[in-house]
């Protein structure tokens, strides 16, 4: 679960990982000193509403800046970029790694065909065409969620805040460029349909569990 804590004093994001790991992200406030975040006592004080020294181990603490950006070109001859090299996004959706995996999944089978001499090098041109809009859309959604979080924090302080985006779309855009562009099949380039199962869950939710 990815949980956004809209505390105007210090917004926080935390999520559950594998094997009992928890990841917390706190906003660095203007009054903070970077030296504070090198102090374990300071870190434990931030974590104290959720976990304590006697029931957790602090494995790592780091300060970083996040960005919302996307490269204009993902290929130069035999060099292709993917993941954070191609696009960077705020952490509000936890979607950065997923976007990178989609990049590589798109590339892997195309490179495999190239090595088998079953496709020409031009197939690599479809990589950016198919992934660019998805990555750009995901970045826009993470920005939207960030604006919503800012709005909740501002409202908690009694301030008026009107984010440009009031929500975010639940469905990824379909692939409109690349290999499927000239296909006459009406379903090509769209996500796999998710029928309702007997448990009243979507198929991908049942499979994931």
Language model feature labels by segment:
Residues 1-66, 72:
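Conserved FAD-binding catalytic core of PHBH/FMO-like flavoproteins
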Residues 16-18, 55-57, 90, 111-112, ...:
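Short C-terminal domain-edge/linker segments immediately following a structured domain
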Residues 58, 64-144:
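Conserved mid-domain beta->alpha element of the FAD-binding
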Residues 45, 113-202, 208-209:
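Helical substrate-recognition/capping region of FAD-dependent monooxygenase/halogenase enzymes
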Residues 23, 67, 87, 200, ...:
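Histidine-centered active-site/metal-ligand motif
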Residues 100, 204-205:
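Alpha-helical hinge/cap motifs
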Residues 42, 103, 199:
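Charged catalytic carboxylate motif
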Residues 50, 91-92, 174, 194:
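Hydrophobic residues in alpha-helical membrane-spanning segments
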